[in-house]
Amino acid sequence: VGKRFGLRASITLVASLLGGAAAASPAADQVRATLEAKYPGSPLGTVTESPVPGIFEVVWGKNLVYVEQTGRYFLFGNLYDMVGRADLTSPRRAELTKVAMDTLPMQDAFARVIGKGERKVALFTDPDCPYCQRLEQAFAQVGNVTIYTFLFPLDSLHPNANLVARKIWCAGESERGAAYDAYMARGAQPDNAGQCDNPVARNVELGRRLNIQGTPYLIGMDGSTKPGALAPADLDAWLNASNRVKAAR
C-alpha cells in the first residue's frame, strides 16, 4: 500500500465493542471485490468483518490493515476492545508472520551451539548490524541454544556487510560459526576473498519473501517470529516459550 490511499497515518482504533472471531460475509465479499478492482495485483488475502460496524479486517501480504467499505480509507494500527481489555490485532498479526521452521533451507545456514543447545532458533543476521552484535551478547548469557544462522546482509544500510557475509561462509563448513563469532565480537574478518559458492543472495531473497524488514530476526520452533535485539531475560523467556521447554544451561 502506498501514498495513494486516503489515510496513511498509523492509527490505533479504540473499540468499545466486545471482540469476536472475524467471519466472512456477503459484505466482506463485496469489499474484497472492490479492493481487487481498485488495486489490481496487490497481495490481497482474506477480508473479514471486524467487530466494528462498517470496518473490515484485510490481510495484505503479511500485513493486517482495516478498511471501510469503499476501499478508500485504510487504518494502520491495533484494534482494542476496551470492554474485554483485549488487543484484537496483535494475535492475528502474530499468526500472519509465523514461519514453519521445517520449511527453511537449513543447507543455507550454519549451526552454532551454546551450552547444551537444547533450544532451537533460526536467526537472520547482518554481520555489520549493531543490534545483531547486541543479540549475540544476550545469546551468550542465556545459553542452552542452537542457533541456525542465516547470513542476511542489508546492503542499503551496511555496504560492506555482503562481502563480510560471503567471507564468513567461505571460511568453510567447520569454521563458519567461529568466523562469525570472531567478527561479531572483534571485527576480525576471515582471510579469504569471499568468492566461494555461497547462499547469501538466496538468503536475501528468502528474507524478502518472508517480509523480513530488518535484523536481527528470530524464528522459533513454534513458528513464532521476533524482530530486533532482546535483553537476556526477554530472550530467555521467548526461547522457552517458542520451544516449550524450561531453561537449562
Describe each model-derived feature in a short phrase.
Residues 61, 221-222:
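Short strand-coil-strand connectors
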Residues 227-228:
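Short, exposed beta-strand-loop hairpins at the edges of beta-sheets
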Residues 156, 223-224:
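Short secondary-structure capping/turn micro-motifs that flank functional sites
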Residues 164-178:
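Acidic, Ser/Thr-rich peripheral helices and adjacent loops at domain boundaries
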Residues 217-218:
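Catalytic His-Asp charge-relay segment
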Residues 178-181, 248:
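A recognition module on extended beta-rich or small alphabeta surfaces enriched in W/G with H and D/E
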